A protein has these predicted regions:
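Polar low-complexity intrinsically disordered regions
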Residues: 12, 53, 66, 76-79, ...
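Short, well-structured alpha-helical interface segments that form or flank functional binding sites
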Residues: 19, 54, 86, 100-108, ...
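Conserved catalytic cores of phosphodiester-cleaving nucleases, focusing on short active-site segments
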Residues: 59, 85-95
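Active-site-adjacent loop/helix micro-motif of nuclease/hydrolase catalytic cores
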Residues: 70-72, 96-108, 125-131
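Domain-level recognition of nuclease-like catalytic cores that cleave nucleotide substrates
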Residues: 125-190
């Protein structure tokens, strides 16, 4: 069965989000085994009783703690109940070139409480400049980011990922404007 281009792009984007989440989880778990990511490579349903694959953000990495359930609940056993005690990363990825969704996702990041937040959006010079200018306006009207370190990652649209060399760029908010901190290229070879 042939799949639409839109379906393929969505699957590529979802795979990329999972890869980034798994990489962040691996990096942080080397420092503390109580750090988990959503989505996770680990079986969190079996390990922690957590069934969802997303926790408020496309990617959420945080420190988890637990408390004991009470016997008066429906469960016959006293089980630990896990909760995120300290968010570390909150990431939103909107590669569908939908300005409304990018603004909604960026607003979620501004409302979040992680030390690190990142918005991922599609490239294209005009689009990139437009998105960054509009997000800058949102930041200028925001009272305070506190200690939050905010990144903006510009990636090619998934339609341009396979068999094409493409550039990406990472920008950091310096309380005044977006500053490019890193750039690179990638190419995904079709099998």
């Amino acid at each position: 069965e042939l799949k639409s281009d839109q379906w393929k792009h969505r699957k590529l984007s979802q795979s990329w989000v999972k890869y980034l989440s798994f990489s962040l989880e691996k990096y942080h778990r080397e420092k503390n085994e109580n750090i988990y990511a959503f989505p996770s490579k680990l079986d969190l349903k079996e390990k922690l009783g957590i069934k969802q694959s997303e926790f408020l953000f496309d990617i959420s990495v945080g420190l988890y703690k637990s408390f004991k359930s009470k016997k008066f609940e429906s469960s016959k056993k006293v089980l630990p109940i896990y909760y995120q005690s300290k968010p570390i990363w909150q990431i939103e990825s909107e590669l569908a070139e939908n300005t409304r969704e990018i603004a909604i996702d960026f607003s979620k990041l501004l409302a979040g409480n992680a030390d690190y937040a990142m918005m991922v959006s599609p490239e294209g010079k005009e689009k990139r400049d437009y998105y960054m200018d509009e997000m800058k306006k949102m930041l200028e009207s925001n009272v305070s980011l506190g200690r939050k370190i905010l990144y903006f990652l510009i990636l090619p649209h998934p339609r341009d990922w396979v068999n094409k060399k493409r550039e990406w760029s990472l920008h950091n908010w310096d309380n005044n404007d977006w500053k490019k901190v890193k750039k690179g290229e990638w190419i995904i070879k079709e099998k």
